Structure formats: structure tokens, C-alpha cells
């Protein structure tokens, strides 16, 4: 049973909430925190914060109590919205008793928040704000603490100019195939504090019109997606992998290949797959937040789903390059620079540098890091790559991810991990091996892999590893493939909130076993 708010109801509630916030006597440009899974109140609170002239500071809803306490202090947060979370019992004990809180209505399956002003009780005290704050483009819009794959989160300061400039992309290029008359259905399920969800889903919907639906829970995601059939769908590579493996679990690859060769049947199969995924009406399907293997893009293309590959980060408001899913020539790139973006490569380090109106003002209360990242107007992305003769950008890895073997050779993990993209028996692969003579690969099995007899699986993976190694220079050859026991999740900190592998945490979890694995004569091992 879906509950609906009209645009008028949403605007009325946001204006009342803005009036309430202004009545609290907060300092000018006060920092207002938000911690909640995606829901309508999140959007309304975000709008109200802007209308009141304050700065939003959203947090990942998966934060632990100590992490949130640190960010509330460091981010100088004056008031906190608490909503759809499952961890209030542990978080609440870390927040001072007198800290101002406004709590969203309780959602099924979430912990009851027992402190602060209740949402409707607070809002209904006020009349709608007549004259919302109108910011200057140079004003600070938001501070987003990145999840990061190493170290403490950094508070990225984005101005209204950065947000406003994103309209250039939609209006001039329209990679999302947005209908400017407002016929757009969006689904929101990736964390709203993540820059892509906020810009691509929330603000594109607000700017150009449409409806925005929220997934109830992870368990209901697949059904909700089928119900909504959005016009625009964005997913991290891990979600695309889940979709792919789900299809192959029902229709094995050989059978699928055969069916796709039959003209009439091929069209029916593609139509059915899209419907079952929830992508029948999708005008654009986009991947981002982490690298997607070219083999996966090509696989989806064969079943009629054309994935646009986008490259960006919080520091540039998710705007840098993109390659359309129908651009067959450059599937292994992340595309050409977007309108208003300049990209170049540092000749010494091969680091990707970019500039444009979308770039952050800096890192909150971290002048040293700001100066190291923003140099003469150029954002140093931390990614390594190159531009081809047609100005298409290719990402080869992270500057900080490179590691040196005991032979003194540097390894770029991402370039090796991409070789495993066609192996459907594996769900996730991480190349590592600092200090070993050769790199090793850690992997977790997919449901397809788990269904195979152990000896058959080992034999198959030994063949695949040998095939991969024939394409590699000697120093890059992978000595061992280890199938890990524990599932990699956000809970055990191997994956971040945006489903990227946190390599530092992988090192912490497994590094003591590296030497033994490498010295084992077998090339495919199960972790004991």
C-alpha cells in the first residue's frame, strides 16, 4: 500500500518545517544534520533546511554511535533530524541528552527514537514560511562526509553554484533522458546523503518534475522496482552484478545465448527480462560510484539494456565524464568530459585532474587536505587514468591503491580485477599482495559458483586463472585465487555504504594469511 504526497502537500510541509527551524534561534548558516534511510521526510527536511537558509550535513544511516558523535562534533552540527534507522539504541547513547533532535515518524522494522520533537507535532505548530531564503550561488549548500575507502571521512563543502551548474548537463546533453514536461518516475534506494542519489534522483526530480518513490527495505527492493518501473534508474556495479547473476540463475548462459539468436524469441526474452527487473519504462540506465567491468556492460547490451557509465565523485558534485550505453566503440572508457568540464592527466603520476563549476569549495576544517587536492583550480581526483586521441577518459586505478611486490614492481589492482568480470561464478574480486613476489586474488563466490561441486568449481577456476595470466606481463601474473569464507558486507566493513571495497579493511582482515596462501602450490584455494 503506497502512501502519496502531492507536490503541493510536500511544499506546504517543507515551508512549515522551515518556519519551525527559523523559530529555534539557531545561528546564521547553522549546520543541520540528517541521519535516516531514504524516505519522504528526508527530502522534506532537506528542502526546509535550504528554505530556512541553513546548511545540510547528511550522514550515512549505517554509522555507528561513536562515528556519528565524532562527525556531529567535527561538523559543528546544531540540530539533528533522526529518522528511518535500525541502530538508534546504540547511536542514541552517544548523543548528548540536551542535543536538539527532530524525529521522523517511525517506520516498520526501524528502532523507535525516544528523544526529541516528534515530526508532526513540531511541524503543525507553524504556518508555512512565506518568503523562503534565496541563497547566493557562492553560499555553502551542503557538507557531505564521504564514506572513503581509507582513513577518516572528509567533509566536502559544496556551494549552490556546484548544484546549480548540474542543470547544464541535463539541459544541454540530457544523458538521463529526462522528460522536461515532468513525465518522470524515479526510485530512491541508494543513500540520499550520497552525492549521486542527491543530484541524479532528488534534485533532477525537483528541477524537472515527476514522482519520486522510496524503497521500503532491502528485502522489498526487487518488488518495489517492479512496481514502480522507473524512467531513470541508477545503480552501483554490485547491483548490476546481482541482476546479472539473478538472470543467469534462472536461465543459464548457454541457453540464454541460444534464445537470443532466434529473432522473434530474442525480442520476447529481452522484454520479459526488463519487465522482471523493473526496467520496462527505463529511458536511461546508469552505473556509477565504482568501476563497472566492460564485460558486464556488453552482457547487458546483449539483453537490450544499455548502461550509461558515469564517472564523478562527491568533490565534483558527481559531474566529470560519461559514456552512453549505445556508444559501442568506447565501452571500456568512462566517456568524454561533460559540458563545462576540463580534464587533463598529470604527466608524472597519471592522476586524473579536472576543473569546472561543479568542483567543491574545499574540505571542512581541513585546509591542508584542501590545498593538496585543489591546486590552481584543478581538482586532483586521486584516480589514475589516460585520455585517448578522441578525448575519452580511461580509469586504470587509484593513486593510493597501487602496491609494490617484493620484486619491486607496482601493481594496479583495478586493471587486474577487470579480467574477472566475465566469471559469473565469482561475485566480487579484490587483487592484493603487498610485499609478495606476485599478486593474489581474493574472491567471494556467487550463488552460481556455490551451486557447483567443489572439484568442478576448482578445475573451472584454475582454467580461468590460467587464461587470465596468459594475457599478463610476468610481474602481474596472479599466483593464487582464494575463495573467502565470510561474505563481504557493509556490516563487516569490507564494503562501504556505496558498495565499494575498502581495501584497507581487506588488508586488515586477511594480510596475515597472504604468505601462506602464496606459498601453497595450489592455484585455487578455499579459505580455511
Task: Report residues per predicted region.
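Conserved AMP-binding/adenylate-forming core of the ANL superfamily
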Residues: 1-39, 43, 47, 64-69, ...
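Conserved C-terminal "lid"/linker of ANL adenylate-forming enzymes
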Residues: 403, 428-431, 467-528
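Conserved ATP-binding/catalytic segment of the ANL
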Residues: 337-339, 344-346, 351-405, 422, ...
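Structural core segment of the AMP-binding/adenylate-forming
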Residues: 24, 51-121, 447
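Conserved AMP-binding/adenylation subdomain of ANL enzymes
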Residues: 164-188, 192-272, 281, 306
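Conserved AMP-binding A3 loop
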Residues: 4-8, 141-167
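Conserved pre-ATP/AMP-binding loop-to-beta segment of ANL
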Residues: 124-145, 152, 178-185
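ANL superfamily adenylate-forming
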Residues: 86-137, 247-276
Amino acid at each position: 500500500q503506497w502512501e502519496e504526497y502531492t507536490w503541493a502537500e510536500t511544499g506546504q510541509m517543507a515551508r512549515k518545517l522551515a518556519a519551525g527551524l527559523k523559530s529555534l534561534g539557531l545561528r546564521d548558516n547553522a549546520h543541520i544534520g540528517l541521519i535516516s534511510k531514504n524516505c519522504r521526510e528526508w527530502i522534506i527536511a532537506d528542502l526546509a533546511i535550504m528554505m530556512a537558509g541553513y546548511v545540510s550535513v547528511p550522514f550515512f544511516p549505517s554509522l555507528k554511535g561513536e562515528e556519528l558523535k565524532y562527525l556531529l562534533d567535527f561538523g559543528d552540527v546544531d540540530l539533528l533530524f533522526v529518522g528511518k534507522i535500525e541502530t538508534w539504541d546504540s547511536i542514541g547513547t552517544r548523543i548528548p541528552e540536551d542535543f536538539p533532535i527532530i524525529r521522523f515518524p517511525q517506520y516498520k522494522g526501524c528502532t523507535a527514537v525516544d528523544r526529541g520533537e516528534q515530526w508532526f507535532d513540531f511541524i503543525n505548530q507553524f504556518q508555512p514560511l512565506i518568503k523562503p531564503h534565496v541563497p547566493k550561488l557562492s553560499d555553502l549548500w551542503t557538507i557531505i562526509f564521504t564514506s572513503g575507502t581509507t582513513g577518516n571521512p572528509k567533509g566536502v563543502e559544496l556551494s549552490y553554484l556546484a548544484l546549480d551548474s548540474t542543470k547544464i548537463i541535463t539541459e544541454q546533453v540530457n544523458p538521463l533522458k529526462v522528460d522536461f514536461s515532468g513525465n518522470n518516475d524515479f526510485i530512491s534506494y541508494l543513500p540520499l546523503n550520497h552525492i549521486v542519489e542527491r543530484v541524479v534522483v532528488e534534485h533532477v526530480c525537483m528541477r524537472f518534475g515527476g514522482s519520486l518513490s522510496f524503497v521500503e527495505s532491502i528485502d522489498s527492493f526487487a518488488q518495489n522496482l517492479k512496481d514502480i518501473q522507473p524512467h531513470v534508474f541508477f545503480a552501483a556495479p554490485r547491483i548490476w552484478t546481482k541482476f546479472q547473476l539473478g538472470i543467469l540463475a534462472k536461465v543459464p548462459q548457454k541457453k540464454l545465448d541460444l534464445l537470443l539468436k532466434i529473432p522473434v524469441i530474442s525480442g520476447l526474452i529481452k522484454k520479459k527480462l526488463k519487465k522482471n527487473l523493473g526496467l520496462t519504462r527505463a529511458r536511461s540506465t546508469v552505473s556509477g560510484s565504482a568501476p563497472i567491468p566492460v564485460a558486464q556492460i556488453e552482457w547487458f547490451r546483449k539483453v537490450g539494456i544499455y548502461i550509461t557509465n558515469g564517472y564523478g565523485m562527491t568533490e565534483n558534485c558527481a559531474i566529470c565524464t560519461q559514456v552512453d550505453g549505445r556508444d559501442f566503440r568506447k565501452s571500456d572508457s568512462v566517456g568524454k568530459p561533460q559540458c563545462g568540464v576540463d580534464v587533463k592527466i598529470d604527466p608524472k603520476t597519471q592522476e586524473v585532474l579536472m576543473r569546472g563549476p561543479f568542483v567543491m569549495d574545499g574540505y571542512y576544517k581541513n585546509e591542508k587536505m584542501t590545498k593538496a587536492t585543489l591546486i590552481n583550480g584543478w581538482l586532483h581526483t586521486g584516480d589514475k587514468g589516460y585520455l585517448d586521441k578522441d578525448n575519452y577518459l580511461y580509469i586504470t586505478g587509484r593513486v593510493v591503491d597501487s602496491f609494490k611486490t617484493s620484486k619491486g614492481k607496482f601493481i594496479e589492482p583495478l586493471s587486474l580485477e577487470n579480467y574477472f568480470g566475465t566469471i559469473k561464478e565469482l561475485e566480487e574480486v579484490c587483487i592484493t599482495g603487498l610485499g609478495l613476489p606476485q599478486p593474489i586474488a581474493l574472491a567471494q563466490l556467487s550463488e552460481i559458483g556455490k551451486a557447483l561441486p567443489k572439484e568442478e568449481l576448482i578445475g573451472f577456476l584454475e582454467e580461468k586463472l590460467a587464461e587470465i595470466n596468459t594475457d599478463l606481463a610476468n610481474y602481474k601474473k596472479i599466483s593464487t585465487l582464494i575463495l573467502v569464507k565470510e561474505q563481504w558486507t557493509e556490516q563487516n566493513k569490507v564494503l562501504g555504504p556505496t558498495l565499494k571495497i575498502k581495501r584497507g579493511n581487506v588488508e586488515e582482515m586477511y594480510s596475515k594469511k597472504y604468505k601462506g596462501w602464496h606459498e601453497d602450490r595450489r592455484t585455487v584455494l578455499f579459505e580455511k
